[in-house]
Amino acid sequence: GLIQTIKEKLKELAGGLVTGIQS
């Protein structure tokens, strides 16, 4: 559903931020 899609996108964004901070 829509909620699941939003959760997936938030996970991707969060992962990108973590990667950016670490590097």
Swiss-Prot record:
Q: Origin organism of this chain?
A: Ranoidea aurea
The subcellular location is: Secreted
Per the record, the similarity remark reads: Belongs to the frog skin active peptide (FSAP) family. Aurein subfamily.
Q: Tell me which domain of life the UniProt entry assigns to the organism this sequence originates from.
A: Eukaryota
Q: In which tissues is it expressed?
A: Expressed by the skin dorsal glands.
What are the annotated disulfide bridges? none
Q: Which GO annotations describe the biological process of this protein? A: defense response
Q: What does this protein do?
A: Has no antimicrobial or anticancer activity.
Per UniProt, the keywords (alphabetical) are: Amphibian defense peptide, Secreted
What is the name of the protein in this document?
Answer: Aurein-4.1
An annotated GO cellular component of this protein is: extracellular region
